[in-house]
């Protein structure tokens, strides 16, 4: 039952279907399994950051203590938040999009 989303992804990505048309929510181990499937021997790039670092990139960054409450902080945070989890777990992604994370 744990691999059901991955099996659905495989079934829909068979011959005669467009890779870009198959969009799935893939989170946690399902996301990792899908990356192994898509990337194969090439492997994939995955470098998780600590939750604190992702939530407050400027506070924990090189300007720590110098930035204060500037209006651009929220904009910077939104840029940092984009990644494979944002793209494929919080939203949906296709096999084609997963390939962007392969080595």
UniProtKB/Swiss-Prot annotation:
Predominant localisation class: secreted
A GO molecular-function annotation: hormone activity
Cellular component, GO, one term: extracellular space
Domain of life of the native organism: Eukaryota
Location within or outside the cell: Secreted
Keyword Disulfide bond recorded: yes
Listed name of the protein: Insulin
Species annotation: Selasphorus rufus
């Amino acid at each position: 039952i744990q691999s059901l989303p991955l099996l659905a992804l495989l079934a829909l990505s068979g011959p005669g279907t467009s890779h870009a048309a198959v969009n799935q929510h893939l989170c946690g181990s399902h996301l990792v399994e899908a990356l192994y499937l898509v990337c194969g021997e090439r492997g994939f790039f995955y470098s998780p950051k600590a939750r604190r670092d992702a939530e407050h990139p400027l506070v924990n960054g090189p300007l720590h203590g110098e930035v204060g409450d500037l209006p651009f902080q929220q904009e910077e945070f939104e840029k940092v938040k984009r990644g494979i989890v944002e793209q494929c777990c919080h939203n949906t992604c296709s096999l084609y999009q997963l390939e962007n994370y392969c080595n």
